[in-house]
């Protein structure tokens, strides 16, 4: 069974190609034009053990918002496609990830009901290279809404914006890997309703 999703999406603001292979090895080929964001998407692929391709052309002369949000939309759509009928997955998983003083928790339910509870307050606004830290929830919201996930993300502690954002991406990645893993003990779709 091949769990691959591929999306091509073009608007007046962005032109994107995203490919996700859930049963990958954690490789990434990412080019968004936003260096720190590329680094975060690479970390997401590596720690979720999925293969990820992102080719994005955006209106970066305006700012990074459209590129980050539209990458999240396309990433979510590709993930939803790769999940298929969701048969055999574990469905639920959580992860706590530290990065120096920062500690972030992510909890994922591959529920088919999109909801994001995002309690990661960055203590101070900062640009990380050409990446605005306040775009982080926009990315996760776009992924969650388009993949049909329920996700809770919490900052346990931390004060360095770089560490907090990176721990958030890695915690989400680890929880996503756990929730989308095929478990041979699971027969069919893991829901009493019979569908997700």
Predicted features and spans:
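Structural preference for solvent-exposed beta-strand-turn elements
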Residues: 1-196
């Amino acid at each position: 069974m091949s769990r691959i999703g591929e999306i091509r999406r073009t608007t007046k603001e962005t032109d994107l190609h995203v490919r996700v292979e859930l049963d990958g090895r954690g490789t990434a080929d990412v080019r968004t034009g936003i260096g720190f964001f590329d680094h975060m998407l690479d970390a997401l692929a590596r720690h979720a053990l999925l293969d990820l391709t992102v080719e994005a052309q955006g209106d970066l002369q305006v700012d990074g918002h459209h590129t980050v949000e539209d990458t999240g939309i396309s990433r979510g759509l590709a993930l939803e496609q790769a999940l298929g009928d969701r048969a055999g997955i574990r469905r639920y998983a959580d992860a706590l990830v530290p990065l120096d003083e920062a500690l972030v928790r992510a909890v994922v339910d591959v529920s088919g009901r999109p909801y994001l509870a995002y309690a990661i307050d960055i203590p101070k606004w900062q640009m990380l290279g050409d990446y605005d830290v306040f775009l982080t929830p926009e990315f996760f919201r776009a992924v969650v809404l388009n993949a049909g996930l329920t996700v809770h993300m919490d900052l346990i502690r931390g004060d360095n914006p770089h560490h907090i954002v990176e721990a958030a991406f890695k915690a989400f990645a680890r929880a996503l890997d756990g929730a989308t893993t095929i478990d041979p003990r699971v027969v069919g779709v893991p829901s009493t309703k019979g569908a997700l």
